[in-house]
Amino acid sequence: MNTIIPISPINNLKTRLSEFLTLEERKNLLFNMLRDIFKALKGLNIYAISKDPEILEFCNNLGAKTIEEKGKGLNQALNQAFSVVNEDLLIVPADIPLIRESHIKEIKKLKEEFEAIIAPSRGGGTNLLYLSRASLINLRYEGFSFLKHLEEFKRNKVSYYIYDSFYLSIDINTPEDLGEIFIHGDGSYTKRYLESLNIKVEPKHSSAGRFKIYRE
């Protein structure tokens, strides 16, 4: 199975975390999330696509083949990657550090029966997408891409499976998202890195959110 990981440049990285983490800290957060993701993807052919040479060098050192992104936007980046590899494809975002090898084993079984497998994010996005062939659908990332991709499956009569996983639904975009790593990320590079920054998490039962995230 071939895996494509599209990655934003460091300067545009996780801007919703910018009031909580410095740019250097966000870069190191990304690198530790990638370590967790690569660990889960062990044994697969991994392709990283980015405009950022530092990110590509890091991924190459982890064992990935790298593609220098030429276009603009996620859909264009992935279509560019499809010119390199276009069958037996698993698209994995760079911000789902709770992915596990067990998820990949299940996907390998499911792909024997279904042409496409999709895991939604909590916000209605697409956090994992398997396609037996790149030509099955038009990619429709951005916005509520989960629903858009379901429309594509139905329009093109593609057999698909919705992989509804809590762990795969967690993507890291805001300070509150970091709380999920403290609860569910034991043993991960990402959690160890956040702990090294003296970040603390407390429960918060209110409409304002689930966690109180702060630094000592």
UniProtKB/Swiss-Prot annotation:
One of its GO terms (molecular function) is phospholactate guanylyltransferase activity. One of its GO terms (biological process) is F420-0 metabolic process. Keywords: GTP-binding, Nucleotide-binding, Nucleotidyltransferase, Transferase. Its EC number is 2.7.7.68. Pathway: Cofactor biosynthesis; coenzyme F420 biosynthesis. It comes from the Archaea. Belongs to the CofC family. Guanylyltransferase that catalyzes the activation of (2S)-2-phospholactate (2-PL) as (2S)-lactyl-2-diphospho-5'-guanosine, via the condensation of 2-PL with GTP. It is involved in the biosynthesis of coenzyme F420, a hydride carrier cofactor. This is 2-phospho-L-lactate guanylyltransferase. It comes from Methanocaldococcus infernus (strain DSM 11812 / JCM 15783 / ME).
